[in-house]
């Protein structure tokens, strides 16, 4: 989990004993170590937001072959392909004048796709999604010529520093410096990691968004003061319920419904991947044997919203809202067991993935899979 190295370390004594480290690739990692409880657990923390731009730099235009392809992959995983041509051809970018002119032609073609917005400066084309998701990145592949059509991608926000500072009470506060690209410019944010209260059940107090601001007062539909997130697609929790993402414009957003308690910030995903399943079989262990998980029970504590599946591309969302819950407000956190059909295939690993994509609490106590093993 330390990959190629750690550039900085610090220790948090309370409320949990965690050794924090900053990796040289800008990820924050932690090692929770509680000897008396026999707890030794590594964890990674990828912050909301993005750093870097998706760009294409055009060079040596005269030798870009006819039919060279560029593939843009949106934050939701869907792709769009653009193709070059050495003569005027509808639906392709032309390579007939110069590096700069070729870049302009490429920009014009990408701009014609409603999913993207492109700008050009000299021979560099910068691309953004028109309506990006609040999580995920825009990436580029130059399938046939990565030299003459060089690219850069959007990437995760970069953690540059971490520090633990004692507070007036018994807990310690963890502070980080996060580097993001905001509205085309590099910005650094000084933020602290919220110490989660596991006993809190008031939906309006939940804070599971990065660089977030809160509003509490009379019912409103406009939330302002968001200049630090200008141009960003933000996650929203309104009156304890999830709300469709919005893009910050002129430092504000407009809600779909009036609300009295609102949290607005950069969304992130929380993902759990189990180790390879080690269960019994008729002939010893199930390790290395073909198996299929067909149902799983997930035991939760004060949680709302969870997906489970065999891979991140095949997840099943577990329902929490019932006919007894009012439709115009958030639902209370759930404690107990949720059983769900597991859409798994036969394989030898038996991995289980659990994911939270909403700004809501998720505490997993245990997972109980039911499976069939072929001996």
Language model segments and positions:
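Beta-sheet repeat architectures centered on beta-propellers
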Residues: 1-51, 55, 146-375
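Extended, beta-strand-rich, solvent-exposed assembly scaffolds of outer structural proteins
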Residues: 51-151, 256-257
């Amino acid at each position: 989990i330390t990959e190629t190295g750690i550039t900085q370390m610090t220790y948090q004594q309370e409320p949990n004993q965690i050794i924090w480290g900053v990796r040289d690739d800008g990820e924050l990692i932690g090692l929770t170590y509680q000897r008396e409880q026999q707890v030794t657990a590594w964890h990674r923390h990828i912050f909301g937001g993005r750093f870097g731009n998706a760009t294409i730099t055009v060079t040596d235009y005269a030798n870009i072959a006819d039919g060279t392809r560029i593939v843009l992959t949106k934050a939701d995983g869907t792709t769009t392909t653009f193709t070059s041509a050495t003569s005027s051809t509808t639906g392709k970018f032309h390579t007939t004048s110069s590096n700069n002119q070729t870049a302009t032609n490429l920009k014009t073609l990408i701009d014609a796709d409603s999913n993207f917005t492109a700008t050009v400066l000299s021979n560099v084309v910068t691309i953004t999604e028109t309506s990006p998701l609040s999580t995920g990145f825009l990436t580029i592949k130059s399938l046939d010529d990565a030299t003459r059509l060089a690219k850069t991608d959007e990437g995760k926000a970069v953690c540059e520093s971490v520090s633990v500072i004692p507070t007036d009470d018994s807990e310690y506060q963890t502070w980080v410096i996060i580097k993001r690209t905001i509205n085309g410019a590099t910005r650094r944010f000084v933020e602290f990691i919220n110490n989660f209260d596991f006993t809190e059940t008031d939906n309006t107090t939940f804070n599971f968004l990065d660089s977030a601001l809160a509003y509490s007062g009379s019912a409103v539909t406009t939330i302002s003061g968001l200049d630090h997130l200008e141009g960003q697609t933000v996650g929203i929790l309104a009156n304890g319920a999830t709300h469709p993402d919005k893009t910050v414009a002129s430092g504000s957003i407009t809600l779909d419904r009036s609300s009295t308690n609102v949290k607005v910030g950069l969304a992130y995903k929380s993902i759990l991947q189990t180790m390879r399943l080690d269960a019994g079989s008729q002939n010893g262990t199930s390790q290395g044997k073909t198996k299929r998980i067909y149902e799983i029970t997930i035991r939760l504590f004060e949680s709302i919203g969870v997906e489970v599946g065999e891979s991140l591309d095949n997840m099943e969302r577990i329902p929490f809202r019932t006919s007894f819950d009012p439709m115009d407000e958030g639902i209370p956190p759930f404690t107990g067991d949720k059983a769900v059909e597991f859409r798994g295939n036969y394989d030898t690993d038996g991995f289980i993935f659990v994911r939270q994509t909403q700004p809501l609490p998720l505490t997993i106590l245990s997972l109980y899979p039911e499976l069939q093993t072929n001996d």
